[in-house]
Amino acid sequence: MQVSVENTSALERRMTIAVPAERVENEVNKRLQQTAKRAKIAGFRPGKVPMTVIRQRFEADARQEAFGDLVQASFYEAIVEQKLNPAGAPAVEPKSFEKGKDLEFVAIFEVFPEFTVAGLESIKVERLSAEVADSDLDNMLEVLRKQNTRFEAVERAAQNDDQVNIDFVGKVDGEAFAGGSAKGTLLVLGSGRMIPGFEEGLVGAKAGEERVVNVTFPEDYQNLDLAGKAAEFTITVNSVSAPVLPELNEAFFAQFGIKESTLEGFRAEVRKNMERELRQAIKTKVKNQVMDGLLAANPIEVPKALLENEVNRLRVQAVQQFGGNIKPEQLPVELFEEQAKRRVVLGLIVAEVVKQFELKPDDAKVREMIEEMASAYQEPEQVIAWYYKNDQQLNEVRSVVLEEQVVDTVLQKATVTDKSVSYEEAVKPAEAPAAAE
């Protein structure tokens, strides 16, 4: 078998392969012999059909099958021989497939980039440290209470944080517009759910009162037909309800699946959850900085096939997450290209770090991570057992642990600065990660 390879770009390869005619004919004859054993042709007993008849009837199909199989087999042999690592399926261009001649074809494909991870010493990481103070715990309990607020009807004027039940009709230039009217809408004043001026116009209103509120749609309003236009809303207030925060009692604790009947026990459970979230937030911020540093220090080209596959994965995820009657391929590629490129590049870099430093998932760290996740459940031992009985779930944890080991490896060489901050600052969502260049 003859093989020649041309580098048509940094990652693209144009491989010409010639398979000897003898091998081609052997493959064709093998298929014809198999066909002869099962062929049913009038006038002949099964298995006794002359080969000349078999060739007349089936040689074209046998040759086509042989072509497909030989292309696949010889391509694999060629990339092994040439020590190439394709990043996707090849585009095949037949050149010669005549009877009695060598099978010749061209395979065009991309290879994975070859590189060594560098610049670890140039990476700078700020590692935060924080504690859950009593004041942080108090604030969290108030947040939990507010999340479970109920509303009771009152006979007074509405104020911010009250919930009003309203009917409204909106008009622009004296004409009602689509989506501008509703009945029985529940609205918490001050929530910012409606356009500016709408909620403010209801402060001081009482049940049974009708108000006319004049507003202007924002210039960046999603409905371009309404953006920047003045509107008049006629609003009828059906009822006004005041917020009532729940008491910190056993019934409230039970809503969170916590069996504790005392405030002290509940606070301890909430603190434990906050500390777990704090550890995860700090770990995530460190990881993001490490990954950003790896990206900046290792600019590499991305095979188009990998990028396309990742874009398609993100499209499918978007449809699954947001629903709607839309097919993934209808979503614009541009929406996902930046994220897809970052994920692909990081995937290649992380894989190279694993290879370069000969990393393997640490079983003790795998167990530690599973125990950490299980601690959030009422029956942690059952959760731990479930993970170890499910290979897919266990392998996912092993992958996460391996990625953490990559981060730890980088941190050993990077410049790390420790900084003490408040709980609120530590758990505050990080800024969007940098894109791959």
UniProtKB/Swiss-Prot annotation:
Domain notes: Consists of 3 domains; the N-terminus binds the ribosome, the middle domain has PPIase activity, while the C-terminus has intrinsic chaperone activity on its own.
Superkingdom assignment: Bacteria
GO molecular function terms attached to this record: peptidyl-prolyl cis-trans isomerase activity; protein folding chaperone; ribosome binding
Function: Involved in protein export. Acts as a chaperone by maintaining the newly synthesized protein in an open conformation. Functions as a peptidyl-prolyl cis-trans isomerase.
Localization: Cytoplasm
Disulfide bonds: none
EC code(s) of this entry: 5.2.1.8
Entry GO terms, CC: cytoplasm
PROSITE patterns: FKBP_PPIASE
UniProt KW keywords: Cell cycle, Cell division, Chaperone, Cytoplasm, Isomerase, Rotamase
Xref: HAMAP family: Trigger_factor_Tig
Pfam family, one: Trigger_C
Name this protein carries in UniProt: Trigger factor
Chain ranges of the PPIase FKBP-type domain: 161-246
One GO BP: protein transport
Stored InterPro entries: PPIase_dom_sf, PPIase_FKBP_dom, Trig_fac, Trigger_fac_C, Trigger_fac_C_sf, Trigger_fac_ribosome-bd_bac, Trigger_fac_ribosome-bd_sf, Trigger_fact/SurA_dom_sf
Species this protein is from: Pseudomonas putida (strain ATCC 700007 / DSM 6899 / JCM 31910 / BCRC 17059 / LMG 24140 / F1)
Similarity annotation: Belongs to the FKBP-type PPIase family. Tig subfamily.
High-level lineage: Bacteria, Pseudomonadati, Pseudomonadota, Gammaproteobacteria, Pseudomonadales
Catalytic activity: [protein]-peptidylproline (omega=180) = [protein]-peptidylproline (omega=0)
SUPFAM superfamilies: FKBP-like, Triger factor/SurA peptide-binding domain-like, Trigger factor ribosome-binding domain
Gene3D superfamilies tied to this protein: 3.10.50.40, Trigger factor ribosome-binding domain, Trigger factor, C-terminal domain
